[in-house]
Each structure stands twice: as C-alpha cells, then as structure tokens.
Swiss-Prot record:
Regulation (activators, inhibitors): Activated by autocatalytic cleavage.
Listed InterPro entries: GGT_CS, GGT_lsub_C, GGT_peptidase, GGT_ssub, Ntn_hydrolases_N
Protein name: Glutathione hydrolase 1 proenzyme
Species for this entry: Sus scrofa
Tissue specificity statement from the Swiss-Prot or TrEMBL entry: Highly expressed in kidney. Detected at lower levels in liver, lung, plexus choroideus and brain capillary endothelial cells.
Lineage: Eukaryota, Metazoa, Chordata, Craniata, Vertebrata
Post-translational modification note: N-glycosylated on both chains. Cleaved by autocatalysis into a large and a small subunit and the autocatalytic cleavage is essential to the functional activation of the enzyme.
Oligomer status and interactors: Heterodimer composed of the light and heavy chains. The active site is located in the light chain.
Length: 568
C-alpha cells in the first residue's frame, strides 16, 4: 500500500513539474502580463496599431518603419485625433551613430493667409478656412528616406486591409464620437463613415473606410508626391476650397518636411533629454524639469502625505512659470525666439524662478508674469517605438481638435486638420483680458505654436532610457513632464508612471485641474496653499511610454484612451 501511495505521489510531482515546464518553455502567443519585452516594443494608443508596429519590426523594419506603419493605423482607429490630413513631429534616435534628430512635418499657414483673417474662433475651428497645409505624408517620406529599411509600400499594407475590411470602434474613438455627435450629424461626409441609422457609432461597432483605403493604395504605389504634386493633389485642393478654404496646389507643391539635426537637449542627472524646439513645447518641458530638478526629487518626496502634498504644489508652480513663458514662443523661422529658448532651457534661469516658488502658497496669475496668451490646442496622438538595435522613435501627430476641421473628402476619404486655430489672432482677446501673442500671429508659410513634445531620454552609455510623449492639447506638456518625473525621480514602474492620476495647470485659466482618483492628500495640500481646484470632466492627457529595465523594454499605453502596447 505504501509503495502504491509513493508511486502516486511521484506521479503527481511529475505532472506538476511537466505543467510548470510547459508554462515556462513552450512558445506562447499571449501578451506578457507586465508588458516587458526583451528585444523591441511599440506603444501606440490602439492595440492593433501597436501590433502592426511590432510586426513591422519583426519583419526586419527599422524603428522609423514601425512608427510609420503604426501611425497609418492610428489615423484610422483614432481618426478623430490624427491622420494624413494633419501633421507631425518625430524625435528619432539612432543607436549606431548615437545621434538624435527631429523631423518637422507640422502644418503651415497657406500663402493666402493673413494675421487678421479670423474674426471669431468658430471660423478657425471648423470649415475649410481652418485648414492649414498638411505635412504628415511628407514627414513619413523624409523619415523613411533617412531611416527606412522595408519598402515604402509595405508600410501601408496592414492599414489598407484594416480600412477595407473594417475594425471595431475603440474606446478613444467612441468617446470622441459621443462628445462630437452633434457636429458629426451636421456634416454628411462625416456621418457617411461614423453614423449608422442616424446615430453615431458606439464602441464595438464595425467601421470601414474604403475611400481612405484607396488613397492609402495610391500613396503606397506613387509615394508622397501623389499627395503634394500628383494624382491626389487636385482633389485635395478642390475639397478644401469647396469648404471655404484657401489652400492651393502651389501650397501643396511647395511643402517640405524639415530635418533638424540639433534638437533641444537638457541634462537630467547622467542622462540627456532630446525634444523638439519651438514652435513645439520642448522649451516649456525643459523649463519645468530644470525648475524641478533643483529640488532633488526622489521616492522619499512622495512617501508621506505632507511630503507628497508639498511636492505636487512645487510641480504645479513649475507648470505655471513655464506656461507664462510659453506665450513668448513662435515659429523661429519667422520670429526671433533665440533668447527666449535660451532662457527656458537655462539652469540659471530655472534657478531664479525656483527661488520665487513659495512652499506655503500659490499666487495670482500676474505673479508669474504672462505677457500674452496663446490659444489652447487639442486632440493629437502619440506613439513610442524601440527597435531591436536600440534605436527609438517618439512621434506625435495631430489634426488638432476632434475630427479637425470637420471637412472630410467624400472622394479621397481624407479628414483635414483645423490647425489654423493654433495661431493667435489680433482680433480675439481671451476672457482674462490678456493680449494675444504676436509671436504666434498668422503669416503665410508659418507654423503655429504647439504643445506637442515627443521625447527620447538617453543615458551616458548611449543607450535609450525612456521614450515618451502624450496627446491632449495644452495638457500634453504637463502629462509628459509628470510621466518623466514619476519614472525617473519617483521610481515608479512605467505602467504606474503612465496611469497615476494627473493634475494640470497652464496658468490661464488660474485653475489646477485634478483627475478623478488623485490622492486626497494632494488635493488637500493644494487647497491649503490657496490653489483653485477643479475636477477634470474626463481625463488629463494620454501618454505612451517605453522604459529600459534590467528585464527588457517595459511599455505602457495609456488606458485613458484604451491603448495597449506590443513587442517581442
């Protein structure tokens, strides 16, 4: 009998060991529980797009190839945020040369544009007049020419299939459709895609984009030239002008993406942060971090309610000082912002501002010395990529407000931006009585100020430490800053760094907005220090980040928009 029990026990042990062995060693298609990938990772704001980026890397593509393929997908699955009718910035790091560069494919004002062309914000937010010259495809082209490995057409194929066959409406698109349903229903060309039986689509409903699939096919075969000086150009111009716009064929013919080989760079301890300069918000992010690094934040800075409350008060005060200086920025090709940028990226200047932060109280907005105001921007999508060889791409793309100008071509399927709304107008003074910023007034060929700041952080060993960026209009810069602070200084893992409830203050309005779920000790500490507190109506920003860990690349796509990363 004892022998029988012994044999049964041995058999049971063997079975357990076999099961454990199978779990540990057999190949699995399931996603890693913690999204840590040994070789490469893609974090987009839609899972299918992360997977398309991952598959591109697996097929031998570069980080840039993966970014382009994933962005083409995001332009479908989160069409309310970005697409080929918009523009983007890419921050690219080459692990072989150990050099970072920026590709600027932001939209520009048409040649017929003028500083006084808008008498109301409605004109700049919706309709053909709000459309700036798109740059997205020229940006892809330049990035691919410099860093592509796979054929250009290969990058379009997964999204052509997706647009043709259809895909379920995701969390982010569903929320945007619900929020914008009145505008969608007002525009038959939008309702053609995003409505069913007179109502906007809901999460899980199937959406197809056959006309945009055809346009993707044309671009795949004919290249970017088809958009700017080829078979698509006349129809693009016709669509915009019939909606009241002023974009011409000459505007499209003359558009070029710009290579910037000297990105804005600041030191974060033994690491270097690379980000775009003006007219993007790299200088704003630099000033925030330079002010705060003087406090030597660490995990101990958030260990007790008292410490955490003081720490977040200091963070908000840094936001306020940085946004006051943001109003001086503009397109450096048209306005001289050299001294402004030099100050905003200077540790000495940051030290002076830090000395003005009181640990016991906030101050009226005039204390921070805003000289002008700049309009809020909105929308956007961000993705982060790290490839097998350690190269990285941080890309932020936008059509500005949800569904851009609301002008969608019923021929090409392209949804056009309303980027002209990102300029300041001399005819529109904001509700706080602060004058609009002349540095951001409209001039033909000029790019408007933007909150976008795609970031790559590199260690002194030349290896990427973090790839991060955000979407969410004026909340982009603060959301990106918080993700960096959470990860690098507080020691949070990347998922917590991205998911931690956020707060935002852009000085005007003089309000500190808090996300639901934020630590009540923080809210109480801010109230004690006389901050005017307001609960966020939805959420603050959407962040995608990848961080190097001893186990591999830890990736996080923000659940606020329903994204999920992929890798291998």
């Amino acid at each position: 009998m004892k022998k029988r029990y012994l044999l049964l026990a041995l058999a049971a042990v063997a079975l357990v060991l076999l099961i454990l062995g199978l779990c540990l060693w057999l190949p699995s298609n399931s996603k890693p529980h913690n999204h840590v990938y040994p070789r490469a990772a893609v974090a987009a704001d839609a899972l299918r797009c992360s997977e398309i980026g991952r598959d591109t890397l697996r097929d031998g593509g570069s980080a840039v190839d993966a970014a382009i393929a994933a962005l083409l997908c995001v332009g479908l699955m989160n069409a309310h945020s970005m697409g080929i009718g918009g523009g983007l910035f890419l921050t690219i790091y080459n692990s072989t040369t150990r050099k970072a560069e920026i590709i600027n494919a932001r939209e520009v004002a048409p040649r017929l544009a003028s500083a006084s062309m808008f008498n109301s914000s409605e004109q700049s937010e919706e309709g053909g007049l709000s459309v700036a010259v798109p740059g997205e495809i020229r940006g892809y082209e330049l990035a691919h020419q410099r860093h592509g490995r796979l054929p250009w057409a290969r990058l379009f194929q997964p999204s052509i299939e997706l647009a043709s066959q259809g895909f379920p409406v995701g969390k982010g698109l569903a929320a945007a459709l619900e929020r914008s349903q009145d505008a969608i229903k007002r525009h038959p060309a939008l309702c053609e895609v995003f409505c069913r039986n007179g109502n906007v689509l809901r999460e899980g409903d199937l959406v197809t984009m056959p006309r945009l699939a055809k346009t993707y096919e044309t671009l795949a075969v004919e290249g970017a030239q088809a958009f700017y000086n080829g078979s698509l150009t006349a129809q693009i111009v016709k669509d915009i002008q019939e909606a009241g716009g002023i974009v011409t064929a000459e505007d499209l013919n003359n558009y070029r993406a710009e290579l910037i080989e000297q990105p804005l760079r600041i030191s974060l301890g033994d690491a270097q942060l690379y980000a775009p300069n003006a007219p993007l918000s790299g200088p704003v992010l630099a000033l925030i971090l330079n002010i705060l690094k003087g406090y030597n934040f660490s995990r101990a800075s958030v260990e007790t309610p008292e410490q955490k409350g003081l720490t977040y008060h200091r963070i908000v005060e840094a936001f306020r000082f940085a946004y006051a200086k943001r109003t001086l920025l503009g397109d450096p090709k048209f306005v001289n912002v050299t001294e402004v940028v030099r100050n905003m990226s200077s540790e000495f200047f940051a030290d002076q501002l830090r000395a003005r932060i009181s640990d016991t109280t906030t101050h009226p907005d005039s204390y921070y010395e805003p000289e002008f105001y700049t309009p809020d921007d909105a929308g956007t999508a961000h993705l982060s990529v790290v490839s097998d060889d350690g190269s990285a791409v941080s890309a932020t793309s936008t059509i500005n407000l949800y569904f851009g100008s609301k002008v969608r071509s019923r021929i090409s399927g392209i949804l056009f931006n309303d980027e002209m709304d990102d300029f300041s107008s001399p005819n529109i003074t904001n509700q706080f009585g602060v004058r609009p910023s002349p540095a951001n007034f409209i001039t033909p060929g000029k790019q408007p100020l933007s909150s976008m700041c795609p970031v790559i952080i590199v260690g002194e060993d030349g290896q990427v430490r973090m790839v991060v960026g955000a979407s969410g209009g004026t909340q982009i810069t603060t959301s990106t800053a918080l993700a960096i602070i959470h990860s690098l200084w507080f020691g949070y893992d990347v998922k917590r760094a991205v998911e931690e409830p956020r707060l935002h203050n852009q000085l005007l309005p003089n309000t500190t907005t808090l996300e639901k779920g934020i630590d009540q000790a923080v809210a109480a500490a801010l109230k004690t220090r006389h901050h005017y507190i307001q609960d966020a109506s939805t959420f603050i920003g959407v962040v995608q980040a990848i961080v190097r860990t001893p186990s591999g690349w830890a990736a996080a796509s923000d659940s606020r928009k329903g994204g999920e990363p992929a890798g291998y």
